[in-house]
């Protein structure tokens, strides 16, 4: 019994060594990469928001990482944003103070970020109001390609979509990015689907 276990362990170690020797993609999910993805997501929100003030992330979590090859990956994030005291032309919202009050605009957001060699290549995001006092449950802010600008509405909303339509668009966008960067068929087994939850280290 012990010999069988030792043999299994030895085969496992040899298999891991073989994968590493053949270039199995290993990506270092350091805090700077996650911060870069979050910053790009918040920047997308601010770039297409109709608010006169900048939004800033209050909390975030990494929901999924799709590794396409040794240099390219797609991150799916969830994060919350709140309006700050800085005007739109203030630049980086990371140093801005949050506005105070019961009716301060706050939204829950999701984003898909494609990164290559540590650099952000593409970002898609959408948000919904976190407070029912701000809008009803069907109202959302959509942040994506400028081709969607016809969906803009009053206040800070950029679209009205049902939950089903929102889910389909988010899923289609993530799949589109993965297909665009899909490696050749003989290397598809290298794709990883990892789930990780990150504490509010971006706060």
UniProtKB/Swiss-Prot annotation:
Entry similarity comment: Belongs to the SPP2 family.
Top-level lineage group: Eukaryota
Positions of disulphide bridges: 86-96, 109-127
Protein's name in the database: Secreted phosphoprotein 24
In-chain residues carrying the UniProt-annotated modification Phosphoserine: 90, 137-138, 162, 165, 174
Predominant location: secreted
Cell compartments where the protein resides: Secreted
PTM comment text: Phosphorylation sites are present in the extracellular medium.
Origin organism lineage: Eukaryota, Metazoa, Chordata, Craniata, Vertebrata
Keywords: Disulfide bond, Phosphoprotein, Secreted, Signal
Organism: Mus musculus (Mouse)
PANTHER family (alphabetical): SECRETED PHOSPHOPROTEIN 24
GO cellular component terms attached to this protein's record: extracellular region; protein-containing complex
A biological process term (GO) from this entry: protein-containing complex assembly
Signal peptide residue numbers: 1-23
Protein's UniProt keywords contain GTP-binding: no
The keyword Cell wall biogenesis/degradation is annotated on this UniProt entry: no
Biological role: Could coordinate an aspect of bone turnover.
